[in-house]
Amino acid sequence: MTFPGDTAVLVLAAGPGTRMRSDTPKVLHTLAGRSMLSHVLHAIAKLAPQRLIVVLGHDHQRIAPLVGELADTLGRTIDVALQDRPLGTGHAVLCGLSALPDDYAGNVVVTSGDTPLLDADTLADLIATHRAVSAAVTVLTTTLDDPFGYGRILRTQDHGVMAIVEQTDATPSQREIREVNAGVYAFDIAALRSALSRLSSNNAQQELYLTDVIAILRSDGQTVHASHVDDSALVAGVNNRVQLAQLASELNRRVVAAHQLAGVTVVDPATTWIDVDVTIGRDTVIHPGTQLLGRTQIGGRCVVGPDTTLTDVAVGDGASVVRTHGSSSSIGDGAAVGPFTYLRPGTALGADGKLGAFVEVKNSTIGTGTKVPHLTYVGDADIGEYSNIGASSVFVNYDGTSKRRTTVGSHVRTGSDTMFVAPVTIGDGAYTGAGTVVREDVPPGALAVSAGPQRNIENWVQRKRPGSPAAQASKRASEMACQQPTQPPDADQTP
């Protein structure tokens, strides 16, 4: 499914978006992991138009570099045209056409950069209808319960399109009309250029309205056609943050439903958020409160959630990830993570490994079958296969000026509360005792113990904390011990 070879597309993204009340350009606000402009350009690129032009104005210095990045991502050329003065949508189209050769002949599709749910099928149907009826212009329309802010479609008695009147110029009776302009058009370029040359700014906003082209072409006796879109969300625009949230919710509903229809169990779609670039394998179960963001990849037969957020994380088949926050990490097949686990960028957990409760890992590789069950920080480390890291262990990776790495071999067992002061290497099959501070390398098969014999300082509390609750308690315990009768030796025992 592609556009005909003589089709160019203009994307209007020059408006300031003042109703967003934001320092971020409107078209760069995101939903489902992409900016609004990115959603639109992805949809258009699927149809491979001959030319694709984005018209920028306000904050063009911030938007243009991102358009370049999207062009690289999509593997095609995207031209940028500049509207240096905000003189209306008609003027914006004139600026966009300046990027085309004067002798360009064909069709031009015009759409907006703030319609994030617009899809390739809708655009393909538009151009197919436009060509089938040989229209000078075909405009997409839809019907809204609340049409405030949209241009109204004025029809003739025989239901032909007579004109589009903007909200600010509409009469009270015209504002009652619920069929609105979706802001997506297909034009014959010669007819478009002719009509644009006759636009007037004699209106409430003193701008050149693209919508006035409809009445001009009709008065010329040319064919003006309208194609109604029943699913209004596909052509809904965003002017404020309320509408952004509404469309984000609607897009998420559609993304979640698509995964469900593909064989993924989503227990509670209302509390599950999945970005458009996320992939999930069959028979995976997603529990409530889960967010799968960026380019996260979930294998088949996994269990994810509840209360889990993964951003750009790759999860292998059959893995379990529960109450975990992770980013830019990988989890191997059959591995178990959580609950209350923090995976920072650069974490790689091998197949059948385990990262348990209150474990934080950063920039570390953890081998197949290795377990870090609980209460541990692993930073800048490489751990081999089938090792076990005891509770409350810490990989001490920062010396105050730089990060150092620790290497732990395979089949290693470390006691609780082991401190690995990097850089150190623990050989294969080595052990550490509880409370050990490892400052030097441990040879393979060795037991590292750093603590000396325990030493008890008698009556320390009475001397250092006299009168304290601890001193009083210890005094009572000593007195009770003194009152205990001493058992005489058993008469039958031989001295």
Curated annotation (Swiss-Prot):
List of catalytic residues: 374 (proton acceptor)
Region called N-acetyltransferase, residue ranges: 263-495
Residues annotated as binding Mg(2+): 114, 239
Known catalytic reactions: alpha-D-glucosamine 1-phosphate + acetyl-CoA = N-acetyl-alpha-D-glucosamine 1-phosphate + CoA + H(+); N-acetyl-alpha-D-glucosamine 1-phosphate + UTP + H(+) = UDP-N-acetyl-alpha-D-glucosamine + diphosphate
Family, as annotated: In the N-terminal section; belongs to the N-acetylglucosamine-1-phosphate uridyltransferase family. In the C-terminal section; belongs to the transferase hexapeptide repeat family.
Function: Catalyzes the last two sequential reactions in the de novo biosynthetic pathway for UDP-N-acetylglucosamine (UDP-GlcNAc). The C-terminal domain catalyzes the transfer of acetyl group from acetyl coenzyme A to glucosamine-1-phosphate (GlcN-1-P) to produce N-acetylglucosamine-1-phosphate (GlcNAc-1-P), which is converted into UDP-GlcNAc by the transfer of uridine 5-monophosphate (from uridine 5-triphosphate), a reaction catalyzed by the N-terminal domain.
Protein's recorded name: Bifunctional protein GlmU
Protein's organism: Mycobacterium bovis (strain ATCC BAA-935 / AF2122/97)
Gene: glmU
